[in-house]
Amino acid sequence: MQRQSKRGVCSRIVVGQLCVAITSLAFSIACVPPMWAAAAHGPLVRAVESVGMTVADADRSIDFYSTVLSFQKISDTELEGSDYEHLEGVFGLRMRVVRMRLGDESIELTEYLSPKGKPVAMDSHSNDRWFQHIAIITVDIDRAYAWLRQNRVQHVSSAPQTLPAYIKPAAGVRAFYFEDPDHHPLEILEFPSDKGNPKWHRSDGKLFLGIDHTAIAVANTSVSLAFYQDVLGFRAVGESENYGPEQEHLNNIFGARLRITSLRGVEGPGIELLEYLTPRGGRSMPVDEQANDLVHHQTRLVTDDLEAALKALQEKHYPLVSSGIVALPKAEIGFHFALIVRDPDGHPIELAKR
């Protein structure tokens, strides 16, 4: 009986050791991160590379951005074919893509030669969630505003506004909203001496210096941060709650109270999330919005690992515009691979890899 008991004890020890080994192996397998978890070791997205807008007449837009806002034309290309159809989600497209630069930052103006899309709704407001603008830095907003008036731009703001001291993160910032010929909202912005990137305080005699950020209207900041911060790897670098008569007249929204969150990548301009706490009546992005519609903006982000980015987006069920990762062998837009996805509010985001 005693020998049997020893054998039983030994058996239990062996079985126990085997269970520990199996458990350890299972734990090790469970702890292997998924492919897209590279974001834990570094952001999936490195930079905002450019902001794109669909325009009705490329020549008219080139003239506006170069003559009025001092952008320089860098390239002018016509694109067509199945690769771009699969990327943009528009069948039978032929588009003229014009790249323009101001300082270190770039925009892309895209005219769809075929097929033509819908115009911007004339009753659009700053709290509608198709709203997106680029913030163009000036060293002298009074002189810049006078220049815009001379060129008969369409106002959104009633006049340039100086944000008050009680909005501490934005105190002293001066800004003005207006529109380009296709009714895309734009902002000119002047930072006080204690705010903004140091390069925005070196004018070299120029009136307009570059693009600080692009701002988008969102329904819920936390939901948007799950996309931009948790998945793509942007850093939240500032937040404020803006309200009062100056903010109302800047946005031209009575009773405007906004939660504003500033995001930055490793390089390039930032992204600002604009959540209207009041009024809450902003309309959602149209479900039938397409790249050839004039309301369309497309923010291009650079990634070193497009496959990991796609995996992360699919894991979270963010809707793709593209059929998947699209190969662009000729790299006419400067990238060999790209895809377009919609953020939680429907804003189109292009992820591109050289």
Model-derived segments and their meaning:
Residues 1-14:
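N-terminal secretory signal peptides that target proteins for export/translocation
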Residues 69-71, 109, 186-189, 234, ...:
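Fold-core signature of tandem repeat domains
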